[in-house]
Curated annotation (Swiss-Prot):
It is an enzyme of class 2 (transferase). This is Sulfurtransferase TusD homolog. Its EC number is 2.8.1.-. SUPFAM superfamilies: DsrEFH-like. Keywords: Cytoplasm, Transferase. Pfam families: DsrE. GO terms for cellular component: sulfurtransferase complex. It is found in: Cytoplasm. GO terms for molecular function: sulfur carrier activity; sulfurtransferase activity. The active site is at residue 80. Could be part of a sulfur-relay system. Belongs to the DsrE/TusD family.
Length: 130
């Protein structure tokens, strides 16, 4: 039986194992034939969606890995808009709305509210938080 998963990532790209563990879990779930419809980045997890993250050459680029996984498996990558704005991760729409000249939301990520997550939770067989 194939299950539909949703993931919630609360840890930043670096300085915590949460994002890396979530990514490894996602790969394992997909390899077993299940699907993941959404990865929601919340609290410090929104930092995974910054296009300004530049890891050293010998480090894993977790943001790029999330982007590639999402493309390969049609997974939505969403950040909590309030948490993201609070931490300086700004999408193009929010930059325009707040009259900012720059935005730094990485390609493939979208910003959404917690209401969107709550609605999506009803569609998943399993939700795993990291």
């Amino acid at each position: 039986m194939s299950l539909v998963y949703g993931l919630v990532v609360n840890g930043p790209a670096y300085g915590s194992q949460a994002s890396r563990k979530a990514f490894q879990f996602a790969e394992a779930v997909l390899a077993q034939g299940h699907s993941i419809k959404k990865v929601f980045f919340y609290q410090e997890g929104v930092l995974n969606a910054s296009s300004l993250i530049l890891p050293a050459n010998d480090e894993v680029d977790i943001t790029k890995q999330w982007q590639e996984l999402a493309l390969r498996h049609d997974i939505e990558l969403e950040t909590c808009v309030a948490a993201a704005l609070r931490r300086g991760v700004i999408g193009e729409e929010e930059a325009s709305q707040h009259q900012l000249k720059q935005h730094n939301l990485a390609v493939g990520f979208q910003q959404a509210g917690l209401g969107g997550l709550a609605t999506a939770l009803l569609k998943f067989d399993r939700v795993v938080q990291f």
